[in-house]
């Protein structure tokens, strides 16, 4: 960045904004880079502004019971704000004085006032000086409030971010991500945009009072007729505005529906193509678009009438003000022109300035109140620690995630004690306790000495993560004691990577120690991964580490925790994404050796981890099921596997199903009907069994902490309701059985217990901030970020950036301390930061874009021609009247004086004929604005153009190859369908209409003035040329600055979301100050771009006005010096010239707006022009009897006989397959060759990132591939993509459930009847799940099927494949994150429904590979081995190294057969425990 010229600018340079000329010159000559932007001043830095406001806010909190944020803002910014308001008022006063001088000039040409003729030139000078003074006052008065608004936004941005880092986890659960982003973007932007208008709330009434006083002097009481009309008009416009808001609110819901489906489509575009759902998704979205456009047109029509009302109102205001006075007393022409000028100013004040100011204050105060309530939310409280403590002790700890429950717990306990209830009534307290909701942890006690390893195990939802949160202080205990030193390091279950280098992610602000760093890298198995990068550990990682595999992210997160020198290490399931071999090595070298003398708490379910732990804590339903050593566990709890795995009471509400992991913890006990408990003397807490998504969560972020909340309660078995019995009374074999019988399969499968009306798009619960932090690893690794080999895509809630400035800020981390960040930002870093965000769109919209836009719809050309014809007709009428006036003027010359002397009659001389002509021009202007036959067709047609462009872009994206889509960000694609389509629908049609309307008004007025005074035309030509050149000069720079500003806005929100994802990690490491500094850096960079844009815009606006002032001076003196007796001509000229001033400036601004909005059109065209996937010939489908497509596919191919059904057997032959993610990228698979027999099951083996999932994508032709694949003798080059992909059934890692009914999700094309769908649902074990929802198959799923578990979603994919009658099934780690019961259901379905199909399985679990006949081992992107299990186990191979001796025995055929012999119950229990727990990851 460069030093700002503003620092050394003179007072005149600041007044005229001349200091911006260097950047304007550079932007005109070349493309601007971030390095060209100027540094901000210290007064605009986020550090200073936030410190200033934070100091005043703290003062407000300390001094008052009811603190007001507006008081803190007032003390910071009020006096400067009022100073600019006074300047603005003085500028507006000059507008009221100008008509007085105009009236005196017109009066000086009256034949009866020849004495004043000599002072006309001085009056003209005075009028010109007023325009000059107004120009000098107005622009600083507008720029100042904009600047103050920017500073207020920066200060409140920082205050909100700091508060976010301090919020308690309970509060974070109540705030949705959308609400938080909206609080920062939508609300705070109001200060930037509207603060300049805020002063008109008091300026406009004063101005109206002054103007009415002057009009009273001219017209007396009749002046109030015009004012009354303006008030009525303002009320009419308010009514139109209310109607428009009604349509927009209705439309917003429809837009939300469309964008939900569109975002799901974009996020899962790979699955859409794999399922061949392009046409179905396109039809679904287009249907929603049709409904949306109906409301769009209504809103546009209302807004059009609202805009037109302003223009035609001028004529009626003048008529209503002048006509009563003229009829009663007669009127002089001087008064008419003066009244016209007054009414123009009065109309602006009443119908525009005052309503806008009121709206600005309403929005701003509403935003301030929202922020004020947010700043008073409950904060995270740091626990008190004893640094000398060497042990970790927890005594009888109970905790609730819901804040109010802890208080209720204490109150209920006190009530029981006061009543002195007997032992037989002790259940009373626990009955009330269950009504309050289940505590997440109950009566937990343990003690571990320094250097010991505590293994924490339990089923899903048992409270393992909550235990760690309580140790960290994120969860406050309701009762009990926690004791440790406070020096904690934490590794989250969900890998969190901050933008920056690998080294910075591991060091994370801790002092750098070379030996320790290298030891940690080695222990976490990162040496090999780092060596593959050219920059080694200095490679910059994007937000979320999207360029890394899940295993790499997990190891970096673990390395960060281990690198910190702490007393206590909390490791929350750190091995979830690691293959067996890597996990084993890291556990031995890192957890057991490197940290041997440290206290460790490890959340795990691996048997070998439990064996090596010093102490074991098994949690079940939040209670301590067991605490002790492993030997004690075997002897005391022989059934511990059922609690560890959750076989008996598996909680189906897994992480994917929960909208918030905290609120879901409460849904454990069932209440029949309503129940209530004592809250206090006046309040009752009601617990109603409502649907989880039955009621929309309020949009306001202000959910009171103590407010009454409704939540769903899940029904549980009697075993769970009655406590934690050691024996449920069931036979032991039944409780440990994993594989259900066919007839009982659905009964054993855990059911969903959410009973509610089908959720709608509007009714869905928003994702909470805490859910973002506790998102499952599936969602974290796959749902939002999809890894590619050489490119990245990401989905975000806000405007997108790639590696963002935060990457650069993180690089500034000092080796000694993370708080010292360099102020300088390297130009190379900036280019790297934004390399993917700089659009390849010209800085100024090309004429080709305009031409292409106009020709999208043929009707648009005819509408534009019609507009031109109407305008030419109006101009012709004006010129005819003008010619008649010139011909009649000499004949009426003798009557002029006579008519003028009659003061009681309306003048009817040739002079008044000019007045009649001017009225005609006014009528023409009104017709021009009102013209239904021109304006409405234009707006209607432009919306139709938007409809066509959306349809073409949607089709293009769906048909684009994945190699192209892999180079784009998902957020960028979504912005085209949201932001750019909104521009085409809302802003562009009316902006184009306004521009055409204003341009024609200016041309007509200039034509009239030029005909009256031809000399004025000579002055008009250079002015128009100057306007065109100045506009072109400014546009080159302004559009680039706007683009840079947009790019600079993304890192602010990216950093916010990144901080929220890793908030627990930040707090554990104490890195909040460092991240606050990074946030301020992001704010400062955005401020530099935004302030420069505001300054250059003001430079341009001031130059426009200066040019016009020169033009007006020329017009004034030409009129005064060349006009003879008769006041009509000079009155028309000067009045029109004053009107041209504002209209022409408005027209130029509209042209800039059109050019800016047309960039959205350019971006849409860029997407429309994307290449389509190759479509081969020779495709046909056999029609069924009812005319629909057949369920089987008929291939016309030289290798297959006519009418043969393909595929028939599922034989696959792969020859020399090479795959790339993007064109020109590195090969991710090389020379893969093998063959699969029909019906064979093949397992894919390899370490994380070896290319197993990539191979499955290559089979579906979702990558750039070379080589050949044949299925049943048919080559993939000889048939279409659709035909090829329909041969495969797919169960991906990331399951695609779009917002729609069960029926639509299973059969989007509507090819199958209900009977067939129910049959398949029963086969895969889904029928009982679907039947419990209202509407059954018509139940609407939202949020990716959040009411379903991950297992249910996998079954949905399985059902799709069964319906599609696929002969080849591709499974990409289907057992990842599944509960054991659902996994066994999937295994059973695979055996039955796909018994004669070819199955290709990618898995980490050894158990999942039991039924594979052959194994394909992939290493370093190549096939290393392809053989049977016996051969692989008999030689040295990656597969042999990856499994334990016990697993090898399990995989051998004789071992499998020997397992069938009868065993005693205890022996069976012990062996099954070791086998199942060994490979289960929770």
Swiss-Prot record:
Keywords: ATP-binding, Cell membrane, Chloride, Chloride channel, Endoplasmic reticulum, Endosome, Glycoprotein, Ion channel, Ion transport, Isomerase, Isopeptide bond, Lipoprotein, Membrane, Nucleotide-binding, Nucleus, Palmitate, Phosphoprotein, Repeat, Transmembrane, Transmembrane helix, Transport, Ubl conjugation. It is a multi-pass membrane protein. PANTHER family: ATP-BINDING CASSETTE SUB-FAMILY C, CYSTIC FIBROSIS TRANSMEMBRANE CONDUCTANCE REGULATOR. Residues 1454-1464 have a biased composition (Basic residues). One of its GO terms (cellular component) is plasma membrane. ATP 1 binds at residues 401, 434, 458-465, 493. The lineage of its organism: Eukaryota, Metazoa, Chordata, Craniata, Vertebrata. Pfam families: ABC_membrane, ABC_tran, CFTR_R. SUPFAM superfamilies: ABC transporter transmembrane region, P-loop containing nucleoside triphosphate hydrolases. Its main location: membrane. This is Cystic fibrosis transmembrane conductance regulator. It is found in: Apical cell membrane; Early endosome membrane; Cell membrane; Recycling endosome membrane. Residues 654-832 are annotated as: Disordered R region. CDD domains: ABC_6TM_CFTR_D1, ABC_6TM_CFTR_D2, ABCC_CFTR1. PROSITE patterns: ABC_TM1F, ABC_TRANSPORTER_1, ABC_TRANSPORTER_2. GO terms for molecular function: ABC-type transporter activity; ATP binding; ATP hydrolysis activity; ATPase-coupled transmembrane transporter activity; bicarbonate transmembrane transporter activity; chloride channel activity; chloride channel inhibitor activity; chloride transmembrane transporter activity. Residues 1-77, 147-195, 244-298, 359-859, 941-991, 1036-1096, 1153-1482 are cytoplasmic. It comes from the Eukaryota. A motif (PDZ-binding) lies at residues 1480-1482. There is a cross-link at residue 688 (Glycyl lysine isopeptide (Lys-Gly) (interchain with G-Cter in ubiquitin)). Residues 1454-1482 are annotated as: Disordered. The chain crosses the membrane at residues 78-98, 123-146, 196-216, 223-243, 299-319, 340-358, 860-880, 920-940, 992-1012, 1015-1035, 1097-1117, 1132-1152. Epithelial ion channel that plays an important role in the regulation of epithelial ion and water transport and fluid homeostasis. Mediates the transport of chloride ions across the cell membrane. Possesses an intrinsic ATPase activity and utilizes ATP to gate its channel; the passive flow of anions through the channel is gated by cycles of ATP binding and hydrolysis by the ATP-binding domains. The ion channel is also permeable to HCO(3)(-); selectivity depends on the extracellular chloride concentration. Residues 81-365, 860-1156 form the ABC transmembrane type-1 domain.
